[in-house]
Design a protein with these regions (language model features):
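C-terminal alpha-helical cap of glycosyltransferases
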Residues: 178-197
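Donor nucleotide-activated moiety binding/catalytic core segment of transferases
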Residues: 71-111, 116
Length: 197
């Protein structure tokens, strides 16, 4: 699913496509907020409280906040602000190309985003509860960005440009970084089928 993120032509075309659709974002700093859901099928799904207005008001008029919520959160109301844009229906990988930095939490998209070597922040005010109740695939000490337990820590981290070790994170989770993973899988399946006949 990530081969396209190694393709500079795809990234450029994706960014240009979205800028044509949202010309107000041209030459702006774009913060992508893409959290995973909380809850479950029995209790319902929800999103962590996130003060997007406070965040965006902490930056100048050249900064925009775009939301890309998890598909299970499609009915969440977002703050009404001229520099906050709901991009629920846009392709996630195309938004990666458009954005300058990512705010997420325990979403698996952080793995994909790391390919682009762009800054990430982890907004997890429920960190201890989440780890206790749900758990995490990865030791959070390996996360390639500042872990923020409240909106003020997040704003401060972005303002100070506090960054993590993206290269190390990417190298742990992507053995191959050449955009040919799909080709390898197809060849492997072909070889297995060929041997079984």
């Amino acid at each position: 699913r990530v081969d396209c993120l190694f393709d500079d032509n795809y990234l450029k075309a994706s960014k240009n496509k979205l800028l044509a659709k949202y010309p107000i974002l041209k030459d702006k700093k774009i913060i992508l907020y893409a959290p995973t859901f909380r809850g479950n099928i029995y209790q319902g799904f929800s999103m962590l409280p996130f003060d997007g207005e406070k965040l965006i008001n902490s930056f100048d008029e050249n900064t925009y906040l775009i939301y890309k919520l998890h598909p299970l959160l499609k009915n969440i109301c977002l703050p009404q602000h001229p520099r906050i844009i709901d991009m629920f229906n846009e392709d996630t990988h195309e938004l990666f190309a458009l954005s300058d930095l990512l705010i997420s939490d325990f979403s698996s998209i952080v793995f994909d985003y790391s390919i682009l070597n762009k800054t990430m922040y982890f907004y997890v005010p429920d960190l201890n509860d989440y780890l206790k109740d749900v758990g995490c695939y990865v030791n959070i000490d390996l996360f390639p960005g500042k872990i923020c337990k409240n909106i003020d820590e997040l704003i401060q981290g972005i303002q100070k440009n506090e960054v993590g070790n993206l290269e190390a994170f990417k190298n742990i989770f992507f053995e191959y970084q050449d955009g040919k993973n799909t080709k390898r899988v197809v060849e492997l399946i072909y070889d297995i089928l060929k041997k079984s006949l």
